[in-house]
């Protein structure tokens, strides 16, 4: 949860510096989101995330670097190739459905 909060704060700072265009904070939702990940079975269940589910991505094993690529709209972002809203898209290996 600390990693999620730290990522959220960094992205917020990037937005204030003009380096990340869109930011929707997930602060205060970390525990509920991590609980959701732990309650479901990876590899069996599917995850339908929304734009504030940063902790779900971290809980499923997405790297902070991959998450940051989406916020700064760079190629290589694993969910949508940085073509959609940050923290939104699909990832077959993690069971994330768009």
Question: Predicted segment positions?
Answer:
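Cofactor-binding active-site loop characterized by glycine-rich and histidine/acidic residues
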Residues: 6-9, 13-98
């Amino acid at each position: 949860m600390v990693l999620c909060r730290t990522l959220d704060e960094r992205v917020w700072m990037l937005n204030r510096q003009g380096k990340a265009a869109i930011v929707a904070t997930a602060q205060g939702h970390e525990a509920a989101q991590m609980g959701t990940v732990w309650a479901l079975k990876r590899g069996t269940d599917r995850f339908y995330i929304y734009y504030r589910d940063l902790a779900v991505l971290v809980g499923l094993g997405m790297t902070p670097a991959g998450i940051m690529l989406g916020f700064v709209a760079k190629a290589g972002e694993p969910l949508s190739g940085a073509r959609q809203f940050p923290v939104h898209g699909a990832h077959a290996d993690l069971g994330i459905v768009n």
